[in-house]
C-alpha cells in the first residue's frame, strides 16, 4: 500500500513538474515575441549571434543545451518502454497507434501544400511533433476536469512522438557526413555499451564519454542532439528484485537530476531564443505562404484528425481501449492539444531551413497552429465534464468502482 501511494505521488509530481515547465515555456515564448517587437529587438537579435568558442550563442543553445533536452527525452523513452506505461502492449497500444496517426496526417497535409517546391517540402516533419511541456501546461489549467488517465495518455503519446521525431531528425536532417568523426562516435558508443554490459552504476564515466560523443557527433554532420539520445540508451536502468529502489538506478538518478533543469532552464531558454519573431515589414500575406499554411494546418487539423482518427479506429477494432473514466469528447479535446508543436516543431524547422524568411514562416505557422490547438482544445475540455450524463447509481455504481480500480492500477505502474 505504501509503495502504491509512493508511485502515485511520483506520477503526480512528474505531471505537475511538466505542467509548471510548460507554463514557464509559454511565458518565455510570449516574452520573446514582446522583446522581438520592442526597442530591445536589436540587442536581442545581436546577443543571439555573439560568437563564443567557434559557435554563436544561438548555435550553443540549439546544438548544446538541446542535447541535454534530448538526453532527458531519451531517458524518458527508455524508462517508459522498459519499466513504465509503454512496457506492455496493452498500455502502449493506444498512444503508439494514436502517435502514428498524429505523425502521418500532419506530414501529408504539409506535403500536399508544398509538393511543388523541393526546397519547402523539406519541412514536412515540422507539424508532426507534440510539445509535452506546453500541452501538460495547458492541461494543468483545467485541473480535475481532465481524468488522470488522459493525462497519462497525452504524456505517453508525446514520448512516442519524441521518439519518432528523433528518428526523423537522424534520417532526414543529416548533413554531409564526416566519416572519421562518425567512426569516432561509433567507438565512443561501443565504450558506453561496454560500461552498460559491465553494470557500471557510477554516472561520471557515462557523462565524460557523453561529452566526447557530443563533440564527435557535432563534427560528423549528424545533428549533435542525437548524441543525447544515444547516451541515454546506454545508461543502465538496472531495475531488479535485488535493487528495487529507484535510487539505485543510474537512469532514474540522472532523469531525476535533469528534470528541473530541463523544465525550468533548458526548454525555456530554447523557447526564448527561438520564438522571437519580428513582425516588422511582415504583411498578412505571410499567412497564405505554403510553409505557413502547411505547418499551421498540419498542427491544427492534421494532429486532431490523425490522433483522434487512429485512436477511434483502434478502439473500435478492439486493439486498444478508451482511457479509464474518459469520454470520447475528452479524448477529442486531448487530440486537439496534440497540435501544440512548439519546441520540437521549431527545432525541426531550424534544421529544415537555413533561409531566414522560411524560418519566420515556420514560426508563424507554429504559433498559429499551436495557439489555435491550445485555445480550442482547452475550451472543449473545460466544457466536456458538464456535458457528461448524470450518474445513475443503480446502473453505474459497479462500472465506476471498476474504472476507479483500473485507474489506480494504471497509476501505480
Curated annotation (Swiss-Prot):
The keyword Zinc-finger does not apply. InterPro entries: Na/H_antiporter_dom_sf (IPR023171), NhaA (IPR004670). Its main location: membrane. One of its GO terms (biological process) is regulation of pH. The keyword Transport applies. One of its GO terms (molecular function) is sodium:proton antiporter activity. It is a multi-pass membrane protein. Gene3D superfamilies: Na+/H+ antiporter like domain. The chain crosses the membrane at residues 15-35, 57-77, 93-113, 123-143, 152-172, 175-195, 211-231, 261-281, 295-315, 333-353, 364-384. It holds the Pfam family Na_H_antiport_1. It catalyses: Na(+)(in) + 2 H(+)(out) = Na(+)(out) + 2 H(+)(in). One of its GO terms (cellular component) is plasma membrane. Keywords: Antiport, Cell inner membrane, Cell membrane, Ion transport, Membrane, Sodium, Sodium transport, Transmembrane, Transmembrane helix, Transport. It is found in: Cell inner membrane. NCBIfam families: NhaA, PRK09560.1, PRK09561.1. Na(+)/H(+) antiporter that extrudes sodium in exchange for external protons. HAMAP family: NhaA (MF_01844). Belongs to the NhaA Na(+)/H(+) (TC 2.A.33) antiporter family. This is Na(+)/H(+) antiporter NhaA. It comes from Caulobacter vibrioides (strain ATCC 19089 / CIP 103742 / CB 15) (Caulobacter crescentus). The lineage of its organism: Bacteria, Pseudomonadati, Pseudomonadota, Alphaproteobacteria, Caulobacterales.
Amino acid at each position: 500500500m505504501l509503495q502504491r501511494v509512493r508511485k502515485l505521488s511520483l506520477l503526480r509530481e512528474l505531471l505537475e513538474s511538466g505542467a509548471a515547465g510548460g507554463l514557464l515555456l509559454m511565458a518565455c515564448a510570449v516574452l520573446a515575441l514582446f522583446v522581438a517587437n520592442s526597442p530591445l529587438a536589436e540587442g536581442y537579435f545581436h546577443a543571439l549571434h555573439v560568437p563564443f568558442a567557434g559557435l554563436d550563442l544561438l548555435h550553443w543553445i540549439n546544438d548544446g543545451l538541446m542535447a541535454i533536452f534530448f538526453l532527458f527525452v531519451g531517458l524518458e523513452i527508455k524508462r517508459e518502454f522498459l519499466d513504465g506505461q509503454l512496457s506492455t502492449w496493452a498500455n502502449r497500444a493506444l498512444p503508439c497507434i494514436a502517435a502514428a496517426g498524429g505523425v502521418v496526417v500532419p506530414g501529408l497535409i504539409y506535403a500536399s501544400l508544398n509538393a511543388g517546391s523541393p526546397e519547402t517540402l523539406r519541412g514536412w516533419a515540422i507539424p508532426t511533433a507534440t510539445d509535452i511541456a506546453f500541452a501538460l501546461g495547458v492541461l494543468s489549467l483545467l485541473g480535475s476536469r481532465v481524468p488522470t488517465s488522459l493525462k497519462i495518455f497525452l504524456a505517453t503519446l508525446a514520448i512516442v512522438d519524441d521518439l519518432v521525431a528523433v528518428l526523423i531528425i537522424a534520417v532526414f536532417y543529416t548533413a554531409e557526413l564526416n566519416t572519421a568523426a562518425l567512426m569516432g562516435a561509433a567507438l565512443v558508443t561501443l565504450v558506453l555499451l561496454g560500461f552498460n554490459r559491465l553494470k557500471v552504476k557510477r554516472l561520471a564515466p557515462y557523462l565524460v564519454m557523453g561529452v566526447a560523443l557530443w563533440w564527435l557527433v557535432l563534427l560528423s554532420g549528424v545533428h549533435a542532439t542525437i548524441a543525447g539520445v544515444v547516451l541515454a540508451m546506454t545508461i543502465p536502468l538496472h531495475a531488479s528484485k535485488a535493487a528495487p529502489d529507484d535510487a539505485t538506478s543510474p537512469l532514474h538518478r540522472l532523469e531525476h537530476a535533469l528534470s528541473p533543469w530541463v523544465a525550468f532552464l533548458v526548454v525555456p531558454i530554447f523557447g526564448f531564443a527561438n520564438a522571437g519573431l519580428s513582425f516588422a515589414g511582415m504583411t498578412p500575406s505571410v499567412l497564405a505562404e505554403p510553409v505557413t499554411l502547411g505547418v499551421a494546418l498540419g498542427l491544427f487539423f492534421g494532429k486532431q484528425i490523425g490522433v483522434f482518427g487512429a485512436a477511434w479506429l483502434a478502439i473500435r477494432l478492439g486493439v486498444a481501449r478508451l482511457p479509464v473514466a474518459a469520454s470520447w469528447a475528452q479524448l477529442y479535446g486531448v487530440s486537439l492539444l496534440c497540435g501544440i508543436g512548439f519546441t520540437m516543431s521549431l527545432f525541426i524547422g531550424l534544421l529544415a531551413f537555413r533561409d531566414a524568411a522560411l524560418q519566420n514562416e515556420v514560426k508563424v505557422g507554429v504559433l498559429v497552429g499551436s495557439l489555435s490547438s491550445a485555445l480550442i482544445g482547452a475550451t472543449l475540455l473545460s466544457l466536456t465534464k458538464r456535458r457528461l450524463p448524470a450518474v445513475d447509481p443503480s446502473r453505474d455504481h459497479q462500472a465506476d468502482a471498476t474504472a476507479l480500480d483500473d485507474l489506480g492500477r494504471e497509476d501505480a505502474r
